[in-house]
């Protein structure tokens, strides 16, 4: 009898890429267990790309099916009223709703707006590194990788920075899908929803030059305006997923460059190589490790029939290590052709936050390694603890020695 892999098991999280590779070689689309329910895991690159582009695999957890309870793992512990606020944005909707939302948001959340923030991101980065000091061992995630994206996203949305601690607490509960902490997870979700509801209302009456105020004002002759629920959901995604993805990128990037000194040397010799190094960091260890879909009808992916009403987990991180797409995929190589990696998704749901994440990653890593030429890990590489989350992989604590 074949054993169905359990994605919550200790053995999986000890070396998840090894498990992904074994599954991909035998069955790139395979049944698994996750959070006590049956699901299908997609680990092959071609199969993942096909799944992410197939609109029969729904992104919308609010859709109703006769006699079927739709369960998206990301909403573990969320009360239904709270879940709906998290599920009314571009990433959690299907066409035509998705088309309308993306069209409206893209009018204001533009590459130009993000690029205009570069001087401010560089300033915040320099200030944080000044506060870190110049010697000894510090937790670079706590002191740098975490506060930088929070400061940036707070300024982008017009949020008072005094709420930084709350964001950290909310996100730490929400990102880890632990059934034993479902109640606390649901409470954190409710608190952040209430905060955003209040923020949206304040921006309606006291608009500023921030992105949230701009999204409130945006209107289209055909598509109207964004509703209060839509604004709340979009702000939630930007605040939580937006800043946490960048935290993970900076933390993982620091770890990878310090544990691959030959690659760090390449970037130091040629600073123009850093943008591609960031792409390789994203490919090598994708922060958004899986993407959830729900089969609205039977779908064949990679020759495997996925039954109607099945939960499908597309493993972006596993697909990025498929040797059919990326030769010698387990080698970290900052000169690699990384085009086509799936860390930002695929198709109509390609992540709109990519320019901001890349900007923060490039600015942060350039400044960090420029400021501290002797930077080294403060603990053994094998002792680094990885977040046990298929929602967003990352490192919560990374001690580094500033002066070597």
Swiss-Prot record:
Q: Which cofactor does it need?
A: heme
Which PANTHER family does this chain map to? Answer: CYTOCHROME P450 YJIB-RELATED, P450, PUTATIVE (EUROFUNG)-RELATED
Residues noted as binding heme in the record, renumbered to the chain: 351
- Classification via Pfam families: p450
| Keywords, sorted A to Z | Antibiotic biosynthesis, Cytoplasm, Heme, Iron, Metal-binding, Monooxygenase, Oxidoreductase
Query: Which GO annotations describe the biological process of this protein?
Result: erythromycin biosynthetic process
Q: Which family does it belong to?
A: Belongs to the cytochrome P450 family.
EC number, as in UniProt: 1.14.15.35
- List the CDD domains: CYP107-like
Q: Which InterPro entries match?
A: Cyt_P450 (IPR001128), Cyt_P450_B (IPR002397), Cyt_P450_CS (IPR017972), Cyt_P450_sf (IPR036396)
What are its GO cellular component terms?
cytoplasm
Q: What is this protein called?
A: 6-deoxyerythronolide B hydroxylase
Molecular function GO labels: heme binding; iron ion binding; monooxygenase activity; oxidoreductase activity, acting on paired donors, with incorporation or reduction of molecular oxygen
Q: What happens when the gene is disrupted?
A: Gene disruption leads to the accumulation of 6-deoxyerythromycin A, an antibiotic with increased stability at low pH.
The primary gene name is eryF
* Location(s), subcellular: Cytoplasm
Question: Please, what other remarks does the record include?
Answer: The bound substrate forms no direct hydrogen bonds with the protein.
User: Which reaction does this chain catalyze?
Assistant: 6-deoxyerythronolide B + 2 reduced [2Fe-2S]-[ferredoxin] + O2 + 2 H(+) = erythronolide B + 2 oxidized [2Fe-2S]-[ferredoxin] + H2O
Major location category of this protein: cytoplasm
Q: In which pathway does it act?
A: Antibiotic biosynthesis; erythromycin biosynthesis
Give a short account of what the protein does.
Catalyzes the conversion of 6-deoxyerythronolide B (6-DEB) to erythronolide B (EB) by the insertion of an oxygen at the 6S position of 6-DEB. Requires the participation of a ferredoxin and a ferredoxin reductase for the transfer of electrons from NADPH to the monooxygenase.
């Amino acid at each position: 009898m074949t054993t169905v892999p359990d994605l919550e098991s200790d053995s999986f999280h000890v070396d998840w890429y090894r498990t992904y590779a074994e599954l991909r070689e035998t069955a790139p689309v395979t049944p698994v267990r996750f959070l006590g329910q049956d699901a299908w895991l997609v680990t092959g690159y071609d199969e993942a790309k096909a799944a992410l582009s197939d609109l029969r695999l729904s992104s919308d957890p609010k859709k109703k099916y006769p006699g079927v309870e739709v369960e998206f793992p990301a909403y573990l512990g969320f009360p239904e009223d709270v879940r709906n606020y998290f599920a009314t944005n571009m990433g959690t909707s299907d066409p035509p709703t998705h088309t309308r939302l993306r069209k409206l948001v893209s009018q204001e959340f533009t590459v130009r707006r993000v690029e205009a923030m570069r001087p401010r991101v560089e300033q915040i980065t320099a200030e944080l590194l000044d506060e870190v000091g110049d010697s000894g061992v510090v937790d670079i995630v706590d002191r740098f990788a975490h506060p930088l994206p929070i400061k940036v996203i707070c300024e982008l949305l017009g949020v008072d920075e005094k709420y930084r601690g709350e964001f950290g607490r909310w996100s730490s509960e929400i990102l880890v899908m632990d059934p034993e902490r479902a109640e606390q997870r649901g409470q954190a979700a409710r608190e952040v929803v209430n905060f955003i509801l209040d923020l949206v209302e304040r921006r309606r009456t006291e608009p500023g030059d921030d992105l949230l105020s701009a999204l409130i004002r945006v209107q289209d002759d055909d598509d109207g305006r964004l509703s209060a629920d839509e604004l709340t959901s979009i702000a939630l995604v930007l605040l939580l997923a937006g800043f946490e993805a960048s935290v993970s990128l900076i933390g993982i990037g620091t770890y990878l460059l310090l544990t691959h000194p030959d690659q760090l040397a390449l970037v130091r010799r040629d600073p123009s190589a850093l943008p591609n190094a960031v792409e390789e960091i994203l490919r090598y260890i994708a922060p958004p490790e899986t993407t959830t879909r729900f089969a609205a009808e039977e779908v064949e992916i990679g020759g495997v029939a996925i039954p109607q009403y099945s939960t499908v987990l597309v493993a972006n991180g596993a697909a990025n290590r498929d040797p059919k797409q990326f030769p010698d995929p387990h080698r970290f190589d900052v000169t690699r052709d990384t085009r086509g990696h799936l860390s930002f998704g695929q198709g109509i749901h390609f992540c709109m936050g990519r320019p901001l994440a890349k900007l923060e990653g490039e600015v942060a890593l350039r400044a960090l390694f420029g400021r501290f030429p002797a930077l080294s890990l403060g603990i053994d590489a094998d002792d680094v603890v990885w977040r046990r989350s298929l929602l967003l992989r990352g490192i919560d604590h990374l001690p580094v020695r500033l002066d070597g």
